[in-house]
Amino acid sequence: IAYRMSDMLNHYLPRPCGRILEIGSGTGFLTRRLMETLHPEKLVLNDICQEMSSCFTDLLGSGQATFLAGDAESLPFPKGQDLIVSCSALQWFVSPELFFERCNTLLKQKGYFAFTTFGRDNLKEVASVTGSGLHYRSLEELEEALRIHYEIVKAHEERICLTFGTPLEVLYHLKHTGVAAVRQQALSLIHISEPTR
């Protein structure tokens, strides 16, 4: 997903891309791609987990990047951004709609806001077994909320189906991608391997 996002940004955005704010930087997969393709002058990285800053010691040490740990929905971010980007994080937000409005105030006049998120079918098998999951917005709902503040340059939905041989492989995938959408409930092999009848 990060590669696709990076390619799309590379197609639409001018280079170098001045100031970039990345929401939900995680381990830095998209960050590294942005550095290679858009060559930002300044990069502000955000993740809810302070521990993720250790993935960026080279960038933070050079002064090219700063790291702000905390909840992106309430954390104060610097204004004057050329690009605000988020890959696979907005589905965790209580109100993406309010965040869209806020991002508009952080962007320069000709700035861009780009994000990926998950659709309604994301992890539906896990949700059916656990009885828990996130509220995913449809593409139409997202577009409606965005049109209030932005001119939409590109919006599309893509279905990516992953298959796994065992429930354990599912757990490993969820752990390594950080997209396990089960609220306040431990996800265990017992939950996943229960037969559904």
Spans of model-derived segments:
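Conserved catalytic/acceptor-binding region of the Class I
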Residues: 108-169, 177-188
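Residue-level detector of conserved catalytic or cofactor/ligand-binding positions
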Residues: 190-196
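A short acidic, Gly/Pro-enriched loop at the edge of an enzyme's catalytic core
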Residues: 73-84
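A short SAM/SAH-binding and catalytic strip from SAM-dependent methyltransferases
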Residues: 83-96
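Class I SAM-dependent methyltransferase SAM/SAH-binding core
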Residues: 19-75
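A short glycine-rich, Lys/Arg-flanked "PGG" loop and its adjoining helix->strand segment in the class I
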Residues: 97-112
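Conserved alpha-helix/loop element of class I SAM-dependent methyltransferases that forms part
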Residues: 1-16
